[in-house]
Amino acid sequence: MLRRYCISAILSLVCLVAGAQSAPLVARFDPANGVLPTPNNLLFAGSVDGTLNIPVADPSDPASATVQALNALDGFSTTGPMIATFSSALDPASLVAGVTVRLFEVELENPVLNPATDSPFAVTRVVQELNGEIDFTVNLLATDPAQSTIEILPLRPLKPKTGYMVALTDGILGQASAAPAFPDLTYIFARYERGPLINPDGSSRFANLSDSQAQALEPIRRLVVAQEHAAASAGLRKAHIVLSWSFMTESTDDALRAIRAGLTALPFTLAPTGLDTASVQGAGLADIYTGTLQLPYYLDAPTLIPTVVLTTRWRGANEAEITRYNPQPVAPQTLSIPVLASMPNAASGQSQPASGWPVVLFQHGITRNRTDLLALADSLAAAGLAAVAIDLPLHGITDSDNPFYNATMERTFNLDLINNETGAPGPDGLIDPSGTHFLNLASLLTARDNLRQGVADLLQLAASLEQAGFDTNQVGFVGHSFGAIVGIPLLAVDDGLIGPASLVMPGGGIAKLLESSASFGPQIQASLAATGLIPGTSAYESYFRAAQQVLDAGDAINYAQAAADKHPTHLVEIIGPPPDQTIPNSVPGAPLSGTEPLLQTMELNSAGTTQNDSNGLHIAVRFLSGAHSSLLDPGPDAEVTIEMQQQIVGFLASAGTLLPIDNTSIVFQP
């Protein structure tokens, strides 16, 4: 009876305090009706393999595909927002990161690692508190016209496989009345710390809580009590908390590290074509070679069903999802893929060292192919650097008249699934353009694993270089656009295979990057509009949040710091005006999307003059003119192409200790 009185007294107090206003401000929390702050560990409930278990009403409904993709993940986004809803409009000035909105890194009881726990995902301690406006920011959610929803945005990627806890306080005020927020009545029950909500026989201990309600709320109560105890240990008084929740971030690099750990050389051969770069309008300083590389293909190739490329994804043994608990993907087949290489010839004035040519791995951008290497080959050859290029997954040469076309090995698989003129589904008798199906946003897991396959392919190439006679102690990397995006995870997990790297116009936060791209955005928005997702709506933004969560394990932003920590790094950005029209420098409302967030996460110094450092440089160069294609195409601005290529060559040839900047008039001076 005493406990019944205590909880009733608490509820009465809330009602009395709130009685002075017609509509008290309440932090919404009603798990029984699906009203939860997100991301939230309650969405693991019922999982048997450590993946999310978000309810899906009808798995056969195509509209549920996005949720089903989320349910293949072992946690929540490292880059996405945290969201909570209140009962009425909020005063935005009262939303202060680190003051009224607190974010903590915490340790959690992981039921997969500790099956004996009786409190799955309970917070056990605070590791550290994150800094407001340095690690995260908070604002009103733009798509909520009621102005009653808050959005907490990381300014740096959260750690993978890590627990986090959010606590909102009564310093959050209503917009109309300036009155403080209160906890939801359900949350008041959930924070009750004087004992269980149920008796040993399962009946409720409280008159205003039914047996079924108490039974459902009791496991949540244990989590909330643990959260508030942890918050109190960090100096936050429990009486000031109006809502708290916790979540665990997903794994990101586990699968790629598993692949790297088991990596061995596979057959890699090259043969001269009898052509040099003069045959492709170059200076003729490099001879052109073609060959093949064997590699494990962790996706399904379209041997019998062409459309399998639209839905395939990485799987473990027994078709298990790839997670931190099961990181090793199984390759359904080994493919032989085409390789293009360039090597300095006599016209370059260079002689091959006894140890073999120093070599640069080159990765082209989306919708391009391996022949993009040839636009850079002469500059590399003049410095005594050979180069090797392979295609990104689902990319390749589609013109059968191209002398480097390989009819049986192109990784476009000669697919004809769309009309090349209109983009409409259905064959037109022509091979689909290179990369058409690479970022398939209708199957987010496929898009993620096409990115990861690109990394795995480059790892295999790097591990097999010695078979073609290259000097494996002098290996550099150049990635352009999406080639640089794939290159950053490569550099984070390569463990010594590669040295210095030049990353030309990369970007992170892929989902909003694509949506905000002047090149890709209109097509993506039109495709989503055809499914009923309209820009500016809540459903539209929810899709992009989900897309980013799925793509996180293949997104450069989650690998950027590790990549820069391990490699001398040179990053190129076009800031204009106009700025890069393909990979945006930054994206309003998405602080981890674009090139600038990568640059910041990698902690690169901006430079406008020649730089030296015997320990290796970490430099970003911002160009004031040029275009996204300027690395390879002098058309938009020949001076920019010359300067970019000279920077790359000087940087790689010096093992990342020298960055020559000759034309200072076309680069930003910090």
Where are these regions (language model features)?
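Catalytic active-site module of serine/aspartate enzymes centered on a nucleophile-bearing elbow/loop
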Residues: 632-670
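Cap/lid segment of the alpha/beta-hydrolase catalytic domain
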Residues: 303-331, 335-336, 352-357, 361-459
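Bacterial N-terminal signal peptides
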Residues: 8-17
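Short glycine-enriched nucleophile-adjacent loop
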Residues: 478-479, 484-495
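A short, hydrophobic beta-strand element of the alpha/beta-hydrolase
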Residues: 502-504
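Acidic, low-complexity Ser/Thr/Gly/Pro-rich repeat segments typical of extracellular/periplasmic
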Residues: 21-305
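Conserved acidic catalytic loop of the alpha/beta-hydrolase fold
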Residues: 341, 351, 444-445, 456-473
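The feature captures the conserved acid-bearing segment of alpha/beta-hydrolase catalytic domains
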Residues: 506-642
